[in-house]
Amino acid sequence: KGLSLALPFDSLFVYGEVLQDKNVPELEYADYMGQTASAYGHVLRDALAKGSFNGLDIADWRHQAAPEFLTTWVESHDTYCNAHESAGLSDNQIRTGWVFLTARQNGTPLFFSRPMGSTRSNYWGDNVIGARGNDEFFHPEVVAVNKFRQAMKGQKEDLQFNPEGTVAVVNRGKKG
């Protein structure tokens, strides 16, 4: 009786996709599971769309839970396929956001692979349940920052920004 998993629980990545909104009891959920920093993703997409983070605090996770327990993303299936909020961002803009997000110390970043063959007039592309999305997760920028994140594990972050809001640098500890 009970739940039987093919893999031990501690080898799985389990989080609560609790999307932020007013009246969502984030601190209460935090007692039970990591959560999604969906409001942070919105601010990041806003900066990418504007080409500047002037007037936006892209250092603040915008969540009541501790940042080490947050799941982060630039976009999700909801923001791309359902609401189309992020659909206007180019692959290059998404990768730029991914590099900044993934280089940071906290949060567990998830990369949304847009459906293969998707366009701005056909968001779902060739999508079928279980099919792999596009190849963006193989892009050298994505691969490099994923390796950087692993190499910098445990190193504190130091974020630097230029006054114009067009350059952000993530320094990590003494190694990167």
What residue ranges belong to the model's regions?
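Active-site-proximal helices and loops of the catalytic beta/alpha 8
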Residues: 1-176
